[in-house]
Design a protein with these regions (language model features):
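A glycine-centered beta->alpha junction motif in the catalytic cores
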Residues: 1-7, 23-27, 147, 151, ...
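Short helix/strand-bridging catalytic loops that position acidic/His residues to coordinate divalent metals
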Residues: 2-6, 123-130, 160-162
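Flexible loop/turn segments at secondary-structure boundaries
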Residues: 37-42, 111-114, 150
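Active-site activation/catalytic loop segments of kinase-like enzymes and analogous catalytic loops
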Residues: 135-185
Length: 185
């Protein structure tokens, strides 16, 4: 995707991978005792704390501001980061993440951990696997795609039409991933 290539089957195959992984490692499929043994086997306490704190509490790069944006931008960012309501919502999400083990998640499911061509998809780096809510992996990749769509405003394209088409493709991936996930699950 770093080369602005369109992968026609990415949403379908990514959703199929997640839906199958989530369904077959949940109590929707497994007997309760087997499911609990699976969760115990994949407790992964060391890497789980990285996700619990890194994603929900310690915002990566939050103290790094581009001086070219000016002090007003830095103050604006800090007002969001330290907003008590937002902080409370982050703690609520973290609690849900920590206490609602519904399935084994990939834990780091984003486009850099997916190898794809026009017809095949392979997923790597499952070292963060542990029990968590169904929605985590899908939310993680959707956030990654939104970030990529935003970054396209500063990346070089041969034409503005090409840029707009690629951003539209990325936005369509979000809806397709969700729709296919629900369909396959």
């Amino acid at each position: 995707m770093n080369k602005n290539h369109l992968f026609p089957e990415l949403a379908k195959q990514g959703a199929q991978y997640l839906a199958a992984t989530h369904f077959y490692t949940s109590e929707f499929y497994l007997p309760t005792e087997e499911y609990r043994k699976l969760l115990a086997h994949f407790m992964n306490a060391e890497l789980r704390v990285v996700m619990e704190n890194g994603i929900f509490l310690n915002i990566f790069g939050a103290d790094q501001y581009d001086p070219a944006c000016g002090p007003e931008f830095e103050e604006y960012c800090k007002s969001i980061r330290f907003d008590p309501n937002l902080e409370f919502q982050r703690y609520k999400l973290r609690h849900l993440f920590m206490s609602k083990s519904e399935t084994l998640i990939h834990g780091d499911f984003h486009t850099s951990n997916i190898f794809a061509d026009d017809t095949h998809l392979k997923v790597i780096d499952m070292e963060y696997t542990f029990g968590a809510p169904f929605s985590y992996d899908l939310g993680f990749i959707i956030a990654n795609i939104i970030s990529q769509a935003c970054s396209e405003s500063v990346r070089p394209f041969d034409t503005e039409t090409h840029r707009k088409n690629y951003v539209a493709y990325l936005i369509s991936l979000i809806e397709l991933l969700y729709t296919y996930y629900i369909q396959f699950f």
